[in-house]
Amino acid sequence: LRLIRCELMKWRRSPVWLAFLFLPILPALLGTLNYMGNLEILQDTWYSLWTQHTLFSCYFFLPVLVGIYSSYLMHLEVEHNNWNKYLSLPISKGEIFLAKFFATLWMIFFCELWICTLFVISGKIIGLIDPIPWQKLLIWCSFGTLGGGVMASIQLLLSLFFQSFALPVGIAFGGGLSGLLFLAKGFGHLWPYALMAYGM
């Protein structure tokens, strides 16, 4: 728990909050515009709007965010030469990795909440009058967080092996795009980068 708290403290005053705040706004905007442009087909109000939001966020923006979170935590140790300090402590490498994993999962969870907030705001702005499906939103976000956790574990490993900040983020973006293909072919449950979309 102490290790996890240490990792969570690294998010304070971190530049990743800019990505956290602004990146989800774009898929929310694109998804809402796409929904408004296809009202004759998308008639299930809140559910249809959610599908359009997640279409853009799960395959393009969320994988990039997970990549940024993971790369940031790992790159921070390289940048400040912290690995030697870590390894001199009476803790295992597995404990260090798990602490970083849970810290990343924490950010993914908050990102899901922010996406839900943007979704509800978008629905209200365009005048959806049906009741907001709060229970379904909770389920979608919970499973989305779990799917994001699988992606985060891979991204943390990639960020551990590649000292470049950008390369793992690029791999995450490519993984998100490939997730669209795997999900379309019915193999979304087998591909780590499709699990977030599969859950949401």
Each language-model region and where it sits:
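Aromatic- and glycine-rich beta-strand/loop motifs that create alpha-glucan
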Residues: 1-24
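Cytoplasmic juxtamembrane interface segments
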Residues: 1-5, 74-87, 145-168
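Membrane-helix interface segments
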Residues: 15-17, 92-94, 98, 132-137, ...
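Pore- or pathway-lining transmembrane helices of multi-pass membrane proteins that form conduits
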Residues: 19-24, 162-180
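Secretory targeting signals
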Residues: 24-66, 98-162
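Terminal transmembrane helical anchor/hairpin motif
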Residues: 30-50, 169-200
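Helix-loop-helix units of permease transmembrane domains in multi-pass membrane transporters
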Residues: 73-105
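Hydrophobic alpha-helical interface/terminus motif in multipass membrane transporters
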Residues: 74, 83-86, 118, 122, ...
